[in-house]
Amino acid sequence: MIYTETSLPGVHFIDMEPIEDSRGFFSRFWCSNEMQTQGLPFEIAQINASLNVNAGTVRGLHYQRDPHAEAKIVSCTSGSVFDVAVDVRPDSATYLNWLGVELTADSNRLLYIPAGFAHGYQALADNTKLLYLVSEPYAPGAEDGLRFDDPAVGIVWPLDVTSVSVKDTEWPLVTGVT
């Protein structure tokens, strides 16, 4: 596996290194020892899956506050997605900076998003599926989020937003983030 830090410090690409033959390929998807070696300690507490029926669907931006802040490793298993991480740590030099990357089912690329970052995505194709590993169990009392269209963050979604949950439209604007 190849680990590369992105332009947003703390967020990393994890590229699988498939071993291919006439049957297809084999690749490690997760390795605790390698994560430790890379300085990215991560214990899997939960694994989530999502199906996004229509292109343009947006989910997020979600995170959990301390002491339940969570890191995620995101993989697109079908279709393609514009995956976004936003730094929500108020004391960070990159506070409210965001990174958007395309993940596809064929890329063998994962995205590591550390604790202290909000996560969201837009499906770029119909029937897009994601699988993500999460370092903390869901804690309803620690749940928080940013609006996907918050002008202070300024995310440029590649497609028109065709669907978003009511809950995700009701997150406070950045001025309400603590």
Question: Model-derived features: where do they sit?
Answer:
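Non-catalytic, conserved peripheral segments adjacent to functional cores
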Residues: 1-106, 127, 132-178
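Conserved metal-binding segment of the jelly-roll/cupin
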Residues: 103-125
